[in-house]
Amino acid sequence: MSLERSTSPNPTERTSLLSDTASTISSRDDVEQSSLKQRRTPIPTGQLGGKVSMHSIIINAEGHLWPYINQFVNDIGVSDGNPRNVGFYSGLIESVFACGEVCSIFMLSRLSDRIGRRPVLLPSALGIAVFTALFGLSSSFTMMLTLRVCAGLLAGATPIVHSIVSELTDDTNNALVVPLYGLITPIGFAIGPLIGGTLEHAATKYPNVFGYELFRKYPYFLPSFVPCCMAIVGVTFGYFFLKETLPSLVKSKKRLERQRSSSSISSENSTLYGATEHIRDSTEETAADEEPDSKPKGITELIRDPSIRAIMASGTFLMFLYTSSDVIFSLYCFTAVEDGGVGLPPEKIGYAFSVAGLIAMLMQLCITPWVLRTFDKAKVYHFCMCSFPLVFALMGCLNPLAQTGYSEINKTLHPTTTGLLYAAIAILLLLARVCVMAFPISMMLVKQTADKHSLATANGLVQVAMTLARAFCPTISSSVFAYSTSHNILGGHFWVVVMVFISLVGVWQSTKIARVTKTKEQL
């Protein structure tokens, strides 16, 4: 039969040729359709910049305190002049910020699910800026606590930013946008501590530039005022570029726009191609309108989801351990070598945190996108949690290292010891910043498991779990550190044993995320 076809007359050859041509065209269409499906959704740069500015305000409101908060508390006089008691009070200041955040997260998240993201986020960010500046004018410990609580109440809008990211992205651009969003935290934690460590007591350090009476009377006002100015710029940028992303409001806006322009569009689409495009667009929009408007799920219903519960539980350990590493590191560096610390000045502490932020920034920019595209997200999350036991174990080695070259007479370190100490701190900071990848992954896991109509509430639940950990973490971790050093338990290193144990429990808890997400995918 094949031989007969090869010797057939022209009509059959023409038929075969047409068939081959049609097949080629069909294959080309399939390739084009496949490429369209795989094409990455364009990233709205204006929107991305708007949410970056909003999130950076919350980060800077906290990061600028780390280098000088212990010295600030000591100068206020609440610790009775004993540096070993500073840790408890400085931890309390950091805790009340998170406590205020816990109290407002649910209310602000639910409110944003009803009235929109912008009306809640922009005023909250502006309020944080004001209370951040006022903190530098504190003259009593009570005033410090009050201002931090007020700022924390407004910082409860953090999950709204997470929801905006989820609503702006899809599966085609998640691996790029989420690491970029996660880049905000290390950038903020690089800039904030640098501002705090450099500008505290600016009138004394730089009398020719900041030698004003205001900065002499309030030596911690300038490092609080600069983040406030940056926040005001961020709010202004967000006001003009951050658009509403709440799905129900976006759909209502599109429906109104379509109704207004339906008559003009019908007249303009007179050609066959235009009419076809109009019919296709109308069909898609009608299908979107016919999609039922599901109400947001309640808190109880979301908590019943095993995936949400696993992310909440593991997120609690993640935030507790991550915050503990920063709190203890700051206190560890502030404490004198003979008291069980490293004995660095606030300026050097600020530089250390800035370097840590730069390391995290490079990881988020260069490594995280590739990791998210290559490996399973739940397994990467578990890997990040596994780094915490090593972080605290290595941190406990800094004081013994410093003691090898410490002169009790001159209160100085030998140059060789100083070099080794800085090298160890660099390795520690590099290892600690590996954990940063877990935060954007947690947000992506919430998006995978939560209903889109309840996204802000689901993010709020996870954020509440994390914020509760951050509320109690500074007080607990700093108290454990102070107790172990003041009572010289295990040579002042009892806190290392406690933190390593908690880290191992967190590692075990993170294994549940991989199990529940795999189970949910199989359903």
Swiss-Prot record:
The keyword Secreted does not apply. Keywords: Glycoprotein, Membrane, Transmembrane, Transmembrane helix, Transport. Glycans are attached at N269, N410. The chain crosses the membrane at residues 88-108, 125-145, 149-169, 175-195, 221-241, 317-337, 352-372, 382-402, 419-439, 455-474, 488-508. Signal peptide: none annotated. One of its GO terms (molecular function) is transmembrane transporter activity. Residues 1-26 have a biased composition (Polar residues). It is a multi-pass membrane protein. PROSITE patterns: MFS, SUGAR_TRANSPORT_1. GO terms for cellular component: membrane. Major facilitator-type transporter; part of the gene cluster that mediates the biosynthesis of psilocybin, a psychotropic tryptamine-derived natural product. This is Major facilitator-type transporter psiT2. It comes from Psilocybe cubensis (Psychedelic mushroom).
